[in-house]
């Protein structure tokens, strides 16, 4: 686990899937899901506005309406003055000054954020980014079939090509063809991820929780172990084991039918 000094407190942070409890990772993932889809600061407000405008201009009113609904929720979170991204970091805080921080309710996470609230934003962001990068790296290394995102690679390839085109415009001077290409790639990047619903019964938060509970039941039934007491490493190892066994059973079933 990682040690850090934040707002005068000695903080212990989970930074490895070997130790990170799955219940914390689930909550952490859900907070990042909300942060990515709704956000809670003025930059997120501006991003929603731009995306809604672009969707509507393209005639995609359904996604435009979803963006406006997410914009409304973003405004609510801004007024609450609580960053969802900060709450995701709070999920990874194991101890503050030697005392365990086991309350993963929203109130408990807010209390952690309050205790660390005097930390300069740059330091807070640095700690979260470092821990997130390490966890993401371990997940893609150990479970590439589950976490290696080909779509993300395509997105970053487009971003790289756009950056090169912008630099060429600066060095060689603007051309109409290059301007059109830059605008096309900008629109592709801005609209790359379709907006999700974060309100009502179809909320992705509700679906996220239901899928997790369903998978915990499956793992517990198949392995006779409590999935909610597993680390992230143990949980996804169990998931892959169950998936392999299901494929083998399916193959055996197919062979019996053809025999």
Please provide the spans of the model-predicted regions.
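An amphipathic, hydrophobic-aromatic interaction surface with interspersed Lys/Arg
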Residues: 1-259
């Amino acid at each position: 686990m990682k040690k850090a000094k934040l707002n005068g407190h000695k903080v212990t942070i989970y930074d490895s899937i070997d130790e990170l409890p799955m219940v914390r990772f689930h909550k952490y993932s859900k907070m990042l899901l909300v942060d990515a889809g709704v956000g809670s600061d003025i930059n997120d407000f501006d991003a929603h506005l731009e995306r809604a405008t672009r969707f509507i201009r393209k005639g995609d009113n359904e996604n435009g309406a979803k963006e406006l609904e997410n914009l409304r929720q973003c405004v609510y979170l801004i007024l609450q003055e609580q960053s969802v991204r900060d709450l995701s970091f709070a999920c990874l805080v194991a101890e503050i000054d030697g005392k365990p921080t086991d309350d993963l309710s929203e109130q408990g996470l807010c209390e952690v954020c309050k205790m660390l609230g005097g930390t300069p934003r740059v330091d807070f962001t640095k700690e979260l980014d470092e821990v997130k990068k390490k966890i993401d790296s371990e997940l893609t290394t150990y479970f590439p079939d589950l976490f290696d995102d080909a779509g993300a690679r395509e997105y970053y390839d487009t971003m790289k090509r756009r950056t090169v085109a912008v630099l060429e415009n600066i060095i060689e001077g603007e051309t109409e063809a290059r301007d059109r290409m830059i605008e096309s790639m900008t629109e592709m990047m801005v609209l790359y991820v379709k907006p999700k619903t974060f309100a009502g019964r179809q909320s992705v938060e509700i679906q996220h929780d239901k899928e997790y509970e369903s998978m915990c039941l499956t793992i517990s039934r198949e392995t006779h172990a409590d999935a909610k007491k597993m680390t992230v490493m143990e949980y996804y190892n169990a998931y892959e084991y169950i998936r392999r066994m299901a494929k083998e059973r399916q193959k055996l079933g197919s062979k019996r039918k053809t025999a």
